[in-house]
Amino acid sequence: MTFQIMTDSTADLSPYYIKKHHLTVLGMTVTVGEETYETIGEAALDNSTLLAAIKKGATVHTSQINSGQFLEVFKKFASADEELLYLAFSSGLSGTYQSALIAQDMVLEEFPSAKITVVDTLAAASGEGFLVEETVKLRDSGKSLTETLEVLSDIIPRLQSRFMVDDLNHLARGGRIPKAVALVGTMANIKPLLDVDPEGRLRQVTKVRGKKKAINQLLEKSLEEMDTAYPRLLISYSGTDEIAQEIKKQAMQKKGISDVDVRPLSPTIVTHTGDGTIAIFSISRKSRE
């Protein structure tokens, strides 16, 4: 391998994929009531436990990865003289990216020739995972880190993240969206559709009456703007996968789509979205506006 790849637990990557491609993944922690859980490894919190606690009214929150955790991992790669690329959770949603930059500076003081590169994906959930997977493809095809970074600088601004959340109050409580947006979502049968803006922050793009219409609009917009050089969709969900599988079925009937993958959102993300979330990720022809 030409370089090592690292990301965090928000990327919705399966343990199988992480192991198969030799990825390093750091996990944020999730606190449910008075109990704090890991989100990576055999003892990781699962979504069914988390959603059951949320349904019962438990207070839940996440804690970002701190600079000390990054420092420990970065030093391991630096001391082994290995080249590392860390793809970080959006700086518009968490301080994790800044923590990584602090750790990077500290490592360079001790190992001036360390090859540690930190990239802000400006993405979350399977959008971040999408970028990790494209990075893996590039690395495994023999591309250098420099060549890979050139591709990432092109596709990161064009990554589209569109989603619908059943209960926006979870995002509002975590400060991810304004409370006024969440209030609209409580109105009868009104579904605000959200995306991730160019700075990696969540925003409302429109309001649709009815869940089915909202989901159809998510899919249609993703397909309409898709770059045919990246003919794939990632569909993520919280709770049951019934709706996500139906979206996949619809998408696979469209001309030009070669790959549609359905996967659960990670507990780190579900903590902020709750049950009933549907998200669609794709690479668009144009940059986010």
Swiss-Prot record:
InterPro entries: DegV, DegV_C, DegV_domain_contain. GO terms for molecular function: lipid binding. Pfam families: DegV. Residues 3-284 form the DegV domain. The keyword Ribosomal protein does not apply. It comes from the Bacteria. Hexadecanoate binds at T62, S94. Keywords: Lipid-binding. May bind long-chain fatty acids, such as palmitate, and may play a role in lipid transport or fatty acid metabolism. This is DegV domain-containing protein YteA.
